[in-house]
Amino acid sequence: MLEKIYSVLGTGSCLVKDGEIIESYLLSDEEVKLIEKIAKVIPFLPEKFKVGFFEHEGGRIIAIKHGEVFICFPARSDNVMSELRKVEVEVYDKILSP
């Protein structure tokens, strides 16, 4: 699934479950470290959480819920809302919800 997401978005991503990265695809060490820090709060998100972004120490990630896991992507621009919308349309609507 992460390979398919890369082919659509052109960015690496990872799967997070219970606050831990369980799989990653084409992320730098820095991106993995950032996501590891933010992933610790993911188990405490409301049940209805679907998609959103998080900021920590100048880095930002986008997280989208898919069943029991969260798919996380590093935000690559200052316009996080635009990236969030792109992830929602390209990943959630086209890949995860067929």
Swiss-Prot record:
It comes from the Archaea. This is Uncharacterized protein AF_1228.
